Swiss-Prot record:
One of its GO terms (molecular function) is N-acyltransferase activity. InterPro entries: Hexapep (IPR001451), Hexapep_transf_CS (IPR018357), LpxD (IPR007691), Trimer_LpxA-like_sf (IPR011004), UDP_GlcNAc_AcTrfase_non-rep (IPR020573). It catalyses: a UDP-3-O-[(3R)-3-hydroxyacyl]-alpha-D-glucosamine + a (3R)-hydroxyacyl-[ACP] = a UDP-2-N,3-O-bis[(3R)-3-hydroxyacyl]-alpha-D-glucosamine + holo-[ACP] + H(+). Belongs to the transferase hexapeptide repeat family. LpxD subfamily. Transmembrane segments: none annotated. It comes from Protochlamydia amoebophila (strain UWE25). This is UDP-3-O-acylglucosamine N-acyltransferase.
Length: 349
């Protein structure tokens, strides 16, 4: 770990472009969460669920937004985005190495096909395999045990963490980050069934394109298209354990959270957010700025808006239905009483 730096609160206010409320000479040496912070730690508050922790925190300073109620005698740094300002401090106290390894250059145990083209200042760690015709751009990092298949291309300043598999003829843009265990370009799940009920594999001859500034989380899998390309748009961030099927096109700057599955040939617009464990059926389109809540099941294309439930519906409708569902026993009893009353009235006639 890098040696820590020390800051006064006055220095921190200048560093993070925040307004200081409190003692400008207070020293900050580290960072911590609200519950565990000491007087030499900075922390941040950005969720009202932790208001009690904020009140009880011993932190030397807390980054808060402009609407947070302040307690007299405590130190605060006021920010429009406390989490981002706090991250700026973390990055300053603990500057990260460009690549997460002690190895530099090309390790002698790496296996590199003679036709591969390796750019300047590329690091290739132990046991990596670089196949025929691969191109790796300048400044990229290839972790231990990575496999890059024939004629795939890796852009500049990419970080490919250990045990990633990038199969043949797949393409990564610049500054792409693949966390450990990612698989790019596995065969799409395509079969046809013959008259005897046997499942016959359909060759998937397409590829995968991952555009600039994408990050893909650990053990996520992105399948190659049957004919053309599965594509991940610029700036999109994908969590761990996500499955993206063949022929899917993910738009720019999407957020896709863990355990989501997206079936084949579905497309998304820009700035789409898909929360955890959502399931998206195939051959659909999610327009720009769609938000899909966790555990939702999307069975039809969606216009811009927020959706939840199985099948997914506008979130206002879902919330209203949940209120009705909680009252269903009351409704059942009311119906039974009405039926009983109707029978009584009919018997009188």
């Amino acid at each position: 770990m890098n040696e820590k730096k020390h800051f006064t609160l006055q220095e921190l206010a200048l560093l993070t472009d925040c307004k200081l409320v409190g003692n400008p000479s207070q020293i900050i040496k580290s960072v911590a969460d609200l519950e565990n912070a000491s007087e030499e730690d900075a922390s941040f508050f950005a969720n009202n669920r932790y208001l009690q922790s904020l009140k009880e925190s011993q932190a030397g300073v807390v980054f808060v937004d402009l609407q947070t109620p302040l307690i007299e005698g405590k130190n605060y740094l006021l920010s429009e985005n406390p989490s981002r300002s706090f991250q700026h401090l973390i990055d300053t106290l603990y500057p990260q190495k460009k690549h997460p390894s002690g190895f530099t250059g090309i390790h002698t145990s790496a296996v590199i096909h003679p036709t591969a083209e390796i750019g300047n200042k590329v690091t290739i760690c132990p046991q990596a395999v670089i196949d025929e015709g691969v191109k790796i751009g300048s400044g990229s990092f290839i972790g231990a045990g990575v496999y890059i298949g024939s004629y795939s291309e890796i852009g500049e300043d990419c970080t490919i963490h250990p045990r990633v598999v990038i199969r043949e003829k797949c393409y990564l843009g610049n500054r792409v980050i693949l966390q450990p265990g990612v698989v790019i370009g596995s065969c799409g799940f395509g079969y046809t069934t013959n008259q005897q009920g046997q499942h016959i594999k359909l060759n998937q001859v397409g590829n995968v394109w991952v555009e600039n500034d994408v990050e893909i989380g650990a053990n996520t899998t992105i399948d190659r298209a049957r004919f053309k390309s599965t594509r991940i748009g610029q700036g999109t961030k994908i969590d761990n354990l996500v499955q993206i099927a063949h022929g899917v096109t993910i738009g720019s700057y999407n957020i896709i959270v863990s355990q989501t599955g997206i079936a084949g040939s579905t497309t998304t617009g820009k700035y789409v957010v898909i929360a955890g464990q959502a399931a998206i059926a195939g051959h659909l389109h999610l327009k720009d700025h769609v938000v899909v809540a966790g555990k939702s099941g999307v069975t039809k294309s969606l216009n811009t808006g927020k959706y939840s439930g199985i099948p997914a519906m506008p979130i206002k409708d879902y919330n209203r239905n949940q209120v009705f569902l909680r009252k269903i026993e009351i409704y059942i009893n009311q119906i039974k009483n009405l039926e009983k009353r109707v029978l009584e009235l009919e018997s009188q006639n």
